[in-house]
Structure formats: C-alpha cells, structure tokens
C-alpha cells in the first residue's frame, strides 16, 4: 500500500515544477489520502474490537428501558465472546465481522 502512495507522489513531481502551489497542494492531498487510508486500515483492525464492545454497552443502555432481561444475557455473552464463543460473537456483533477474521 505504501509503495502505491509513493508512486502517486513521484508522478506529481514534474507537476510541482510547472505550478508550484498547485502541484504542492495536489501532492499534499494525495499524501493525506494515502495516510488516512493507511490509518483507516489499522483503525478498522485494531479499534474495531474496542468499538464493538462499546457499541454493545451503548445498546444495553438503550435497551434497558425496553428489555431489561436481555442485559444480563448480553453481559455474559460479552465476557465469553473473545475467548471461545465465536458463534455468539457473530450473532451479537453482526455489523462488525472484523474481530472474527482476526480469530481465524
């Protein structure tokens, strides 16, 4: 991924000579895009798990009024999930299949 970013930057080299401010802005934007893409990849892998758990807690707070019975059940699932309840994790955290991939 990093090499692709570098290629884009070098491709914009000559453009910098013709229009300094324009070329510079363009190359900067490309670099920022590359960096954010790189960061995004890392984020989706590392932070996804944390976000997942936070999401569950938020949901629990929301559902407290509607279905209080689900809270202890979800709490138990949360504790078991990361260790061995892969199936339960999938059922509880459907929107984020990322952590499951890390397990495999």
UniProtKB/Swiss-Prot annotation:
Organ and tissue specificity: Testis.
Modified residues (Phosphoserine): 96
Family classification: Belongs to the protamine P3 family.
Key words of the record: Chromosome, Developmental protein, Differentiation, DNA condensation, DNA-binding, Nucleosome core, Nucleus, Phosphoprotein, Spermatogenesis
Disulfide topology: none
Classification via InterPro entries: PRMP3
PANTHER family assigned to the protein according to its UniProt record, in alphabetical order: PROTAMINE-3 (PTHR14317:SF0), SPERM PROTAMINE P3 (PTHR14317)
Described purpose of this protein according to its UniProt entry: Protamines substitute for histones in the chromatin of sperm during the haploid phase of spermatogenesis. They compact sperm DNA into a highly condensed, stable and inactive complex.
Native source organism of the sequence: Rattus norvegicus
Stretches the record annotates as Disordered: 1-104
Start-end of Acidic residues biased regions: 45-70
Gene Ontology terms, MF aspect: DNA binding
Record gene name: Prm3
GO biological process: cell differentiation; chromosome condensation; flagellated sperm motility; spermatogenesis
Predominant location: nucleus
Keyword Disulfide bond in record: no
Subcellular location: Nucleus; Chromosome
Protein name, per record: Protamine-3
A GO term from the CC aspect: nucleosome
